[in-house]
Amino acid sequence: MGLQPKAKLYSPALLGLATGLAQYPFDPDLPLTAEARSRSCGSVIALGLALDESGRIARIGMRVSACAIGQASAALLAQGTIGAEPSRIAATAAGLSAWLAGEGDLPPWPGLEPLAPALAHPGRHGALLLPWKAAVAALSHGA
């Protein structure tokens, strides 16, 4: 019984998300870059973004050294980022923080459902937020 929550946390859907990260290689020449590091687990994410002429996100690249939760969260960020307005990234990051603090529902971002079991695992909250923090930091460099 003690292993059941862990099995739910690391579902096939969550583990499968990490394989999509190869589609978003980090490019140091992207104009908006940032790195985020977790103090609790040592995970590191380097992220780069480029905006199009209308100010929407046109490109994203990442280098992810994180646990399965961090990798899945990064993949979901990348999958929904192209064409998004920067304010949507910031709003989703804030929504995820609020949700993890028990102050709201999972924010409206495509495919976040596999991350839902992480709510019951506070030790994984930092890894889940890491790619979003990197994206917000990168976008703040373009403000």
What are these regions (language model features)?
Residues L17-V64:
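Structured beta-strand/loop patches that form or line metal/cofactor-binding pockets in enzymes
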Residues A68, A84-S87:
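A generic structural signal for alpha-helix starts
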Residues G2-Q23, S87-A143:
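C-terminal binding/interaction regions
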Residues V64, I82-G83, P131:
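A generic structural motif
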